[in-house]
Amino acid sequence: MRASWVANRQGKSNVSQLHFARQGMITEEMAYVANRENLPESLVMEEVARGRMIIPANINHLNLEPMAIGIASKCKVNANIGASPNASDVGEELKKLELAVKYGADTVMDLSTGGVNLDEVRTAIINASPVPIGTVPVYQALESVHGSIEKLSEEDFLHIIEKHCQQGVDYQTIHAGLLIEHLPKVKGRLTGIVSRGGGILAQWMLYHHKQNPLFSRFDDICEIFKRYDCSFSLGDSLRPGCLHDASDEAQLAELKTLGQLTKRAWAHDIQVMVEGPGHVPMDQIEFNVRKQMEDCSEAPFYVLGPLVTDIAPGYDHITSAIGAAMAGWYGTAMLCYVTPKEHLGLPNPEDVREGLIAYKIAAHAADIARHRSGARDRDDELSKARYAFDWNKQFELSLDPERARQYHDETLPADIYKQAEFCSMCGPKHCPMQTKITDKDLDDLEDVIKSKDASKINL
Protein backbone atom coordinates (compact mmCIF):
# COMPACT_ATOMS: atom_id res chain seq x y z
CA MET A 1 0.00 0.00 0.00
CA ARG A 2 2.77 2.46 0.90
CA ALA A 3 5.20 1.76 -1.94
CA SER A 4 4.04 4.73 -4.00
CA TRP A 5 3.81 6.94 -0.92
CA VAL A 6 7.45 6.50 0.06
CA ALA A 7 9.03 6.15 -3.39
CA ASN A 8 10.07 9.79 -3.60
CA ARG A 9 11.31 9.88 -0.01
CA GLN A 10 14.05 7.28 -0.44
CA GLY A 11 17.52 8.73 -0.01
CA LYS A 12 16.42 11.97 1.63
CA SER A 13 18.19 13.06 4.80
CA ASN A 14 15.00 13.24 6.88
CA VAL A 15 11.80 11.39 6.00
CA SER A 16 10.04 11.52 9.37
CA GLN A 17 6.38 12.38 9.75
CA LEU A 18 7.39 15.05 12.26
CA HIS A 19 9.70 16.65 9.71
CA PHE A 20 6.96 16.83 7.09
CA ALA A 21 4.34 18.04 9.60
CA ARG A 22 6.57 20.89 10.69
CA GLN A 23 6.79 21.95 7.05
CA GLY A 24 3.00 22.07 6.89
CA MET A 25 2.73 18.92 4.76
CA ILE A 26 -0.08 16.40 5.21
CA THR A 27 1.44 13.08 4.20
CA GLU A 28 -0.52 10.10 2.95
CA GLU A 29 0.06 8.51 6.35
CA MET A 30 -1.46 11.51 8.12
CA ALA A 31 -4.49 11.45 5.83
CA TYR A 32 -4.92 7.72 6.41
CA VAL A 33 -4.74 8.19 10.18
CA ALA A 34 -7.22 11.06 10.07
CA ASN A 35 -9.72 8.83 8.31
CA ARG A 36 -9.20 5.97 10.78
CA GLU A 37 -9.54 8.24 13.80
CA ASN A 38 -12.34 10.40 12.38
CA LEU A 39 -10.20 13.50 12.93
CA PRO A 40 -9.50 16.47 10.62
CA GLU A 41 -6.31 16.00 8.60
CA SER A 42 -5.11 19.41 9.73
CA LEU A 43 -5.47 18.40 13.39
CA VAL A 44 -3.42 15.24 12.84
CA MET A 45 -0.69 17.29 11.15
CA GLU A 46 -0.72 19.83 13.99
CA GLU A 47 -0.54 17.16 16.71
CA VAL A 48 2.35 15.42 14.95
CA ALA A 49 4.17 18.74 14.48
CA ARG A 50 3.70 19.54 18.15
CA GLY A 51 5.03 16.13 19.19
CA ARG A 52 1.84 15.05 20.99
CA MET A 53 1.09 12.41 18.35
CA ILE A 54 3.34 10.00 16.51
CA ILE A 55 2.70 7.88 13.43
CA PRO A 56 5.28 5.06 13.59
CA ALA A 57 5.87 4.32 9.91
CA ASN A 58 9.30 3.21 8.75
CA ILE A 59 9.62 3.82 5.00
CA ASN A 60 10.76 0.19 4.58
CA HIS A 61 7.59 -1.25 6.15
CA LEU A 62 5.55 -1.13 2.96
CA ASN A 63 2.54 -3.23 4.02
CA LEU A 64 1.95 -1.07 7.10
CA GLU A 65 -1.52 0.35 7.72
CA PRO A 66 -0.59 3.63 9.46
CA MET A 67 -1.94 4.38 12.94
CA ALA A 68 -1.53 7.13 15.49
CA ILE A 69 -0.39 7.20 19.11
CA GLY A 70 -1.32 10.35 20.99
CA ILE A 71 -3.82 11.96 23.31
CA ALA A 72 -5.97 13.25 20.43
CA SER A 73 -6.45 9.71 19.10
CA LYS A 74 -7.97 6.61 20.65
CA CYS A 75 -6.01 4.84 23.38
CA LYS A 76 -3.87 2.15 21.77
CA VAL A 77 -2.67 -1.29 22.87
CA ASN A 78 0.67 -2.97 22.15
CA ALA A 79 1.21 -6.72 22.25
CA ASN A 80 4.64 -8.19 22.97
CA ILE A 81 5.76 -11.37 21.23
CA GLY A 82 9.19 -12.90 20.71
CA ALA A 83 11.29 -16.01 21.00
CA SER A 84 13.55 -16.81 23.94
CA PRO A 85 16.59 -19.11 24.19
CA ASN A 86 14.35 -21.70 25.85
CA ALA A 87 11.20 -21.62 23.75
CA SER A 88 9.50 -20.71 20.47
CA ASP A 89 10.38 -20.56 16.78
CA VAL A 90 9.53 -18.46 13.72
CA GLY A 91 6.23 -20.25 13.11
CA GLU A 92 5.14 -19.83 16.71
CA GLU A 93 5.91 -16.10 16.64
CA LEU A 94 3.99 -15.61 13.39
CA LYS A 95 1.03 -17.39 14.98
CA LYS A 96 1.23 -15.01 17.93
CA LEU A 97 1.38 -12.06 15.53
CA GLU A 98 -1.69 -13.30 13.68
CA LEU A 99 -3.62 -13.68 16.93
CA ALA A 100 -2.48 -10.27 18.18
CA VAL A 101 -3.69 -8.54 15.02
CA LYS A 102 -6.94 -10.56 15.04
CA TYR A 103 -7.79 -9.45 18.56
CA GLY A 104 -6.97 -5.81 17.97
CA ALA A 105 -3.32 -5.10 18.76
CA ASP A 106 -2.49 -1.63 17.47
CA THR A 107 1.25 -2.30 17.49
CA VAL A 108 3.39 -5.38 18.16
CA MET A 109 6.86 -5.55 19.68
CA ASP A 110 9.25 -8.35 18.78
CA LEU A 111 11.20 -8.95 21.98
CA SER A 112 13.11 -12.01 20.78
CA THR A 113 16.28 -12.59 22.76
CA GLY A 114 17.65 -15.81 21.28
CA GLY A 115 17.02 -19.42 20.41
CA VAL A 116 16.36 -18.47 16.78
CA ASN A 117 17.91 -16.39 14.02
CA LEU A 118 16.83 -12.98 15.31
CA ASP A 119 17.04 -11.30 11.90
CA GLU A 120 14.98 -14.06 10.30
CA VAL A 121 12.25 -13.80 12.95
CA ARG A 122 12.15 -10.01 12.81
CA THR A 123 12.01 -9.85 9.02
CA ALA A 124 9.24 -12.46 8.91
CA ILE A 125 7.21 -10.54 11.47
CA ILE A 126 7.61 -7.21 9.66
CA ASN A 127 6.70 -8.72 6.29
CA ALA A 128 3.56 -10.28 7.78
CA SER A 129 2.44 -7.33 9.89
CA PRO A 130 -0.03 -4.60 8.93
CA VAL A 131 0.60 -2.91 12.30
CA PRO A 132 3.75 -1.07 13.43
CA ILE A 133 6.55 -3.25 14.76
CA GLY A 134 8.77 -2.20 17.65
CA THR A 135 12.00 -3.75 18.94
CA VAL A 136 14.57 -3.43 21.72
CA PRO A 137 17.92 -3.40 19.86
CA VAL A 138 20.14 -3.89 22.92
CA TYR A 139 18.98 -7.52 23.08
CA GLN A 140 20.50 -8.31 19.70
CA ALA A 141 23.51 -6.12 20.40
CA LEU A 142 24.38 -8.33 23.36
CA GLU A 143 23.57 -11.51 21.43
CA SER A 144 25.89 -10.38 18.61
CA VAL A 145 28.88 -10.60 20.99
CA HIS A 146 27.66 -13.89 22.48
CA GLY A 147 26.53 -12.29 25.72
CA SER A 148 29.90 -10.75 26.55
CA ILE A 149 29.37 -7.31 28.14
CA GLU A 150 33.11 -6.62 28.07
CA LYS A 151 33.21 -7.07 24.27
CA LEU A 152 30.11 -4.96 23.58
CA SER A 153 31.16 -1.64 21.99
CA GLU A 154 29.33 1.60 21.23
CA GLU A 155 29.58 0.77 17.54
CA ASP A 156 27.88 -2.58 18.13
CA PHE A 157 24.84 -0.74 19.48
CA LEU A 158 24.70 1.64 16.51
CA HIS A 159 25.17 -1.19 14.00
CA ILE A 160 22.19 -3.14 15.37
CA ILE A 161 20.03 -0.02 15.62
CA GLU A 162 20.60 0.77 11.94
CA LYS A 163 20.04 -2.87 10.96
CA HIS A 164 16.61 -2.77 12.61
CA CYS A 165 15.80 0.44 10.74
CA GLN A 166 16.88 -1.09 7.43
CA GLN A 167 14.64 -4.10 8.06
CA GLY A 168 11.60 -1.86 8.54
CA VAL A 169 11.19 -1.58 12.32
CA ASP A 170 8.80 1.30 13.02
CA TYR A 171 9.91 2.19 16.55
CA GLN A 172 12.74 1.13 18.81
CA THR A 173 13.00 1.17 22.57
CA ILE A 174 16.18 3.11 23.24
CA HIS A 175 17.31 3.01 26.88
CA ALA A 176 19.18 6.29 26.70
CA GLY A 177 17.78 7.86 29.88
CA LEU A 178 19.68 5.62 32.30
CA LEU A 179 22.82 7.51 33.30
CA ILE A 180 25.76 6.17 35.25
CA GLU A 181 25.00 8.67 38.03
CA HIS A 182 21.51 7.17 38.40
CA LEU A 183 22.75 3.71 39.36
CA PRO A 184 23.49 4.46 43.05
CA LYS A 185 19.88 5.63 43.42
CA VAL A 186 18.76 2.02 42.97
CA LYS A 187 20.09 1.18 46.44
CA GLY A 188 17.23 0.35 48.79
CA ARG A 189 14.90 -1.00 46.13
CA LEU A 190 13.24 -4.35 46.70
CA THR A 191 13.63 -5.48 43.09
CA GLY A 192 16.47 -3.36 41.71
CA ILE A 193 16.48 -2.94 37.92
CA VAL A 194 13.77 -5.01 36.23
CA SER A 195 14.17 -3.72 32.67
CA ARG A 196 16.11 -6.24 30.57
CA GLY A 197 17.52 -3.49 28.37
CA GLY A 198 18.26 -1.33 31.39
CA GLY A 199 19.97 -4.24 33.09
CA ILE A 200 22.25 -4.78 30.10
CA LEU A 201 23.26 -1.12 30.03
CA ALA A 202 23.76 -1.01 33.80
CA GLN A 203 26.14 -3.97 33.53
CA TRP A 204 27.95 -2.25 30.65
CA MET A 205 28.44 0.96 32.64
CA LEU A 206 29.53 -0.92 35.76
CA TYR A 207 32.12 -2.87 33.76
CA HIS A 208 33.47 -0.03 31.60
CA HIS A 209 32.98 2.84 34.09
CA LYS A 210 31.72 4.95 31.19
CA GLN A 211 28.49 6.80 30.45
CA ASN A 212 25.58 4.97 28.84
CA PRO A 213 26.57 4.72 25.15
CA LEU A 214 22.96 5.23 24.03
CA PHE A 215 23.04 8.58 25.82
CA SER A 216 26.50 9.64 24.66
CA ARG A 217 25.72 8.62 21.06
CA PHE A 218 22.11 9.85 21.09
CA ASP A 219 22.63 12.36 18.29
CA ASP A 220 24.14 9.62 16.12
CA ILE A 221 21.03 7.51 16.72
CA CYS A 222 18.88 10.47 15.68
CA GLU A 223 20.82 10.70 12.41
CA ILE A 224 20.05 7.04 11.75
CA PHE A 225 16.37 7.29 12.68
CA LYS A 226 15.63 10.31 10.50
CA ARG A 227 16.71 8.46 7.34
CA TYR A 228 14.08 5.76 7.88
CA ASP A 229 11.38 7.51 9.92
CA CYS A 230 11.94 5.18 12.84
CA SER A 231 10.37 6.56 16.02
CA PHE A 232 11.91 6.66 19.47
CA SER A 233 10.26 4.78 22.28
CA LEU A 234 12.41 6.10 25.08
CA GLY A 235 12.84 3.20 27.49
CA ASP A 236 12.39 3.49 31.24
CA SER A 237 15.26 1.36 32.52
CA LEU A 238 14.48 2.29 36.12
CA ARG A 239 10.77 1.57 36.07
CA PRO A 240 9.58 0.07 39.36
CA GLY A 241 9.33 -3.71 39.46
CA CYS A 242 7.15 -3.73 42.56
CA LEU A 243 4.82 -1.38 44.43
CA HIS A 244 7.51 -0.62 47.02
CA ASP A 245 9.78 0.93 44.37
CA ALA A 246 7.13 3.04 42.59
CA SER A 247 7.72 6.76 42.09
CA ASP A 248 11.11 6.64 43.81
CA GLU A 249 14.10 8.90 43.26
CA ALA A 250 15.69 6.59 40.69
CA GLN A 251 12.56 6.41 38.52
CA LEU A 252 11.98 10.17 38.60
CA ALA A 253 15.63 11.01 37.90
CA GLU A 254 15.52 8.93 34.74
CA LEU A 255 12.18 10.47 33.75
CA LYS A 256 13.75 13.93 33.88
CA THR A 257 16.51 12.75 31.54
CA LEU A 258 13.90 11.24 29.20
CA GLY A 259 12.28 14.66 28.99
CA GLN A 260 15.60 16.20 27.97
CA LEU A 261 16.15 13.49 25.36
CA THR A 262 12.65 14.08 23.99
CA LYS A 263 13.58 17.66 23.20
CA ARG A 264 16.90 16.57 21.65
CA ALA A 265 15.09 14.14 19.36
CA TRP A 266 12.54 16.79 18.43
CA ALA A 267 15.42 19.11 17.51
CA HIS A 268 16.27 16.51 14.84
CA ASP A 269 12.59 16.25 13.80
CA ILE A 270 12.35 12.68 15.11
CA GLN A 271 9.10 11.28 16.51
CA VAL A 272 9.15 10.30 20.19
CA MET A 273 7.03 8.49 22.72
CA VAL A 274 8.13 7.83 26.29
CA GLU A 275 7.79 4.56 28.18
CA GLY A 276 6.51 4.33 31.74
CA PRO A 277 5.93 1.93 34.62
CA GLY A 278 5.44 -0.78 35.65
CA HIS A 279 4.15 -1.56 39.17
CA VAL A 280 2.29 1.41 40.68
CA PRO A 281 -0.30 1.65 43.49
CA MET A 282 -3.62 3.01 42.26
CA ASP A 283 -3.24 6.25 44.22
CA GLN A 284 0.05 7.05 42.41
CA ILE A 285 -1.07 6.44 38.82
CA GLU A 286 -2.40 9.94 38.18
CA PHE A 287 0.80 11.46 39.58
CA ASN A 288 2.91 9.32 37.26
CA VAL A 289 0.94 10.32 34.17
CA ARG A 290 0.90 14.02 35.06
CA LYS A 291 4.62 13.97 35.90
CA GLN A 292 5.48 12.41 32.54
CA MET A 293 3.42 15.00 30.68
CA GLU A 294 5.18 17.76 32.59
CA ASP A 295 8.74 16.45 32.27
CA CYS A 296 8.38 15.21 28.67
CA SER A 297 6.44 18.15 27.21
CA GLU A 298 3.33 16.02 26.50
CA ALA A 299 5.09 13.50 24.27
CA PRO A 300 2.86 10.39 24.08
CA PHE A 301 3.12 8.19 27.16
CA TYR A 302 3.39 4.40 26.72
CA VAL A 303 3.02 2.36 29.91
CA LEU A 304 3.50 -1.29 30.83
CA GLY A 305 0.37 -1.95 32.88
CA PRO A 306 0.83 -0.66 35.49
CA LEU A 307 0.17 -3.53 37.90
CA VAL A 308 -1.67 -2.32 40.99
CA THR A 309 -0.80 -5.28 43.22
CA ASP A 310 2.07 -7.77 43.32
CA ILE A 311 0.29 -10.81 44.78
CA ALA A 312 -1.47 -12.32 41.76
CA PRO A 313 0.96 -14.28 39.56
CA GLY A 314 -1.10 -16.01 36.90
CA TYR A 315 -3.61 -13.15 36.89
CA ASP A 316 -1.38 -10.18 36.13
CA HIS A 317 -3.34 -9.44 32.96
CA ILE A 318 -6.08 -8.43 35.43
CA THR A 319 -3.95 -6.64 38.03
CA SER A 320 -2.35 -4.60 35.25
CA ALA A 321 -5.49 -3.93 33.21
CA ILE A 322 -6.92 -2.15 36.26
CA GLY A 323 -3.95 0.20 36.30
CA ALA A 324 -3.93 0.48 32.51
CA ALA A 325 -7.55 1.67 32.43
CA MET A 326 -6.75 4.34 34.99
CA ALA A 327 -3.59 5.42 33.15
CA GLY A 328 -5.52 5.65 29.89
CA TRP A 329 -8.21 7.73 31.56
CA TYR A 330 -5.58 10.17 32.83
CA GLY A 331 -4.15 10.59 29.32
CA THR A 332 -1.71 7.76 28.57
CA ALA A 333 -1.60 7.24 24.80
CA MET A 334 -0.67 3.54 24.56
CA LEU A 335 -0.89 0.58 26.91
CA CYS A 336 1.54 -2.33 26.70
CA TYR A 337 -0.36 -5.50 27.45
CA VAL A 338 0.54 -7.97 30.17
CA THR A 339 -0.37 -11.64 29.82
CA PRO A 340 -1.30 -14.20 32.49
CA LYS A 341 2.26 -15.57 32.12
CA GLU A 342 3.90 -12.33 33.31
CA HIS A 343 6.64 -13.11 35.85
CA LEU A 344 6.12 -16.83 35.21
CA GLY A 345 7.15 -17.75 31.67
CA LEU A 346 7.03 -17.11 27.92
CA PRO A 347 3.45 -16.45 26.73
CA ASN A 348 1.83 -18.92 24.35
CA PRO A 349 -0.79 -17.92 21.75
CA GLU A 350 -3.69 -18.33 24.21
CA ASP A 351 -1.88 -16.08 26.71
CA VAL A 352 -1.51 -13.47 23.96
CA ARG A 353 -5.27 -13.60 23.39
CA GLU A 354 -6.09 -13.30 27.11
CA GLY A 355 -3.72 -10.40 27.66
CA LEU A 356 -4.80 -8.53 24.58
CA ILE A 357 -8.53 -8.76 25.31
CA ALA A 358 -7.92 -7.52 28.87
CA TYR A 359 -6.08 -4.50 27.47
CA LYS A 360 -8.57 -3.77 24.71
CA ILE A 361 -11.15 -3.54 27.50
CA ALA A 362 -8.90 -1.16 29.46
CA ALA A 363 -8.20 1.07 26.45
CA HIS A 364 -11.86 1.15 25.43
CA ALA A 365 -12.92 2.04 28.98
CA ALA A 366 -10.39 4.89 28.93
CA ASP A 367 -11.75 6.18 25.60
CA ILE A 368 -15.26 6.24 27.05
CA ALA A 369 -14.09 8.01 30.20
CA ARG A 370 -12.28 10.63 28.10
CA HIS A 371 -15.44 11.16 26.00
CA ARG A 372 -13.67 10.45 22.74
CA SER A 373 -15.93 10.81 19.73
CA GLY A 374 -17.94 7.66 19.06
CA ALA A 375 -16.21 5.71 21.82
CA ARG A 376 -19.46 4.43 23.34
CA ASP A 377 -21.32 3.71 20.10
CA ARG A 378 -20.48 0.02 20.10
CA ASP A 379 -21.51 -0.33 23.75
CA ASP A 380 -24.89 1.22 23.00
CA GLU A 381 -25.42 -1.03 19.98
CA LEU A 382 -24.59 -4.12 22.02
CA SER A 383 -26.94 -2.98 24.79
CA LYS A 384 -29.76 -2.61 22.27
CA ALA A 385 -29.04 -6.10 20.95
CA ARG A 386 -29.00 -7.47 24.49
CA TYR A 387 -32.37 -5.88 25.30
CA ALA A 388 -33.79 -7.29 22.06
CA PHE A 389 -32.35 -10.76 22.80
CA ASP A 390 -30.46 -10.61 19.50
CA TRP A 391 -27.81 -13.08 20.56
CA ASN A 392 -25.92 -13.25 17.27
CA LYS A 393 -25.56 -9.48 17.12
CA GLN A 394 -24.33 -9.47 20.72
CA PHE A 395 -21.64 -11.96 19.76
CA GLU A 396 -20.64 -9.93 16.68
CA LEU A 397 -20.26 -6.72 18.68
CA SER A 398 -18.21 -8.35 21.43
CA LEU A 399 -14.47 -7.75 21.73
CA ASP A 400 -14.08 -11.54 21.65
CA PRO A 401 -17.05 -12.97 19.69
CA GLU A 402 -15.74 -16.52 19.89
CA ARG A 403 -15.55 -16.47 23.69
CA ALA A 404 -18.99 -14.87 24.05
CA ARG A 405 -20.58 -17.50 21.79
CA GLN A 406 -18.68 -20.32 23.53
CA TYR A 407 -19.88 -19.32 26.99
CA HIS A 408 -23.49 -18.93 25.84
CA ASP A 409 -23.48 -22.28 24.07
CA GLU A 410 -22.02 -24.23 26.99
CA THR A 411 -25.54 -24.53 28.42
CA LEU A 412 -27.81 -23.58 25.52
CA PRO A 413 -26.06 -24.82 22.35
CA ALA A 414 -29.06 -25.38 20.05
CA ASP A 415 -29.73 -22.77 17.36
CA ILE A 416 -33.25 -22.24 18.69
CA TYR A 417 -31.77 -20.60 21.77
CA LYS A 418 -30.26 -17.85 19.59
CA GLN A 419 -33.83 -16.49 19.42
CA ALA A 420 -34.70 -17.25 23.04
CA GLU A 421 -35.61 -14.39 25.36
CA PHE A 422 -33.48 -15.75 28.17
CA CYS A 423 -30.12 -17.33 28.95
CA SER A 424 -29.24 -20.07 31.41
CA MET A 425 -28.65 -17.57 34.23
CA CYS A 426 -32.30 -16.60 34.79
CA GLY A 427 -34.09 -19.19 32.69
CA PRO A 428 -37.32 -18.59 30.74
CA LYS A 429 -39.37 -17.06 33.57
CA HIS A 430 -37.13 -14.71 35.51
CA CYS A 431 -35.19 -12.50 33.05
CA PRO A 432 -35.95 -8.86 33.95
CA MET A 433 -35.43 -7.78 30.35
CA GLN A 434 -38.54 -9.74 29.36
CA THR A 435 -40.63 -7.20 31.24
CA LYS A 436 -40.35 -4.77 28.33
CA ILE A 437 -41.71 -1.72 30.11
CA THR A 438 -42.15 0.82 27.31
CA ASP A 439 -41.85 4.60 27.37
CA LYS A 440 -45.61 4.72 26.76
CA ASP A 441 -46.18 2.61 29.87
CA LEU A 442 -44.13 5.07 31.88
CA ASP A 443 -45.87 8.09 30.33
CA ASP A 444 -49.22 6.59 31.32
CA LEU A 445 -47.93 5.96 34.83
CA GLU A 446 -46.82 9.57 35.13
CA ASP A 447 -50.34 10.66 34.22
CA VAL A 448 -51.77 8.39 36.92
CA ILE A 449 -49.35 9.75 39.51
CA LYS A 450 -50.22 13.33 38.61
CA SER A 451 -53.94 12.65 38.78
CA LYS A 452 -53.89 11.14 42.28
CA ASP A 453 -52.95 12.29 45.71
CA ALA A 454 -49.32 11.32 46.08
CA SER A 455 -49.87 10.16 49.66
CA LYS A 456 -52.37 7.57 48.50
CA ILE A 457 -49.83 5.76 46.34
CA ASN A 458 -47.07 5.88 48.95
CA LEU A 459 -44.83 8.37 47.17
Swiss-Prot record:
GO CC field: cytosol
Catalytic activity: 5-amino-1-(5-phospho-beta-D-ribosyl)imidazole + S-adenosyl-L-methionine = 4-amino-2-methyl-5-(phosphooxymethyl)pyrimidine + CO + 5'-deoxyadenosine + formate + L-methionine + 3 H(+)
GO BP annotation list: thiamine biosynthetic process; thiamine diphosphate biosynthetic process
Protein residues bound to Zn(2+): H279, H343
Record pathway: Cofactor biosynthesis; thiamine diphosphate biosynthesis
Annotated keywords: 4Fe-4S, Iron, Iron-sulfur, Lyase, Metal-binding, S-adenosyl-L-methionine, Thiamine biosynthesis, Zinc
Cofactor dependence: [4Fe-4S] cluster
GO terms assigned for molecular function: 4 iron, 4 sulfur cluster binding; carbon-carbon lyase activity; zinc ion binding
Transmembrane in keyword set: no
InterPro entries with a match to the protein in the record: ThiC, ThiC/Bza_core_dom, ThiC/BzaA/B
Cofactor note: Binds 1 [4Fe-4S] cluster per subunit. The cluster is coordinated with 3 cysteines and an exchangeable S-adenosyl-L-methionine.
Superkingdom, natural source: Bacteria
EC number: 4.1.99.17
Binding site for substrate: N80, M109, Y139, H175, S195, R196, G197, D236, S237, L238, R239, E275, Y302
Record-annotated disulphide pairs: none
Binding site for [4Fe-4S] cluster: C423, C426, C431
PANTHER family, alphabetized: PHOSPHOMETHYLPYRIMIDINE SYNTHASE, CHLOROPLASTIC, THIAMINE BIOSYNTHESIS PROTEIN THIC
Function: Catalyzes the synthesis of the hydroxymethylpyrimidine phosphate (HMP-P) moiety of thiamine from aminoimidazole ribotide (AIR) in a radical S-adenosyl-L-methionine (SAM)-dependent reaction.
Family: Belongs to the ThiC family.
Name recorded for this polypeptide: Phosphomethylpyrimidine synthase
Source organism per UniProt: Prochlorococcus marinus (strain MIT 9211)
Lineage: Bacteria, Bacillati, Cyanobacteriota, Cyanophyceae, Synechococcales
Gene: thiC
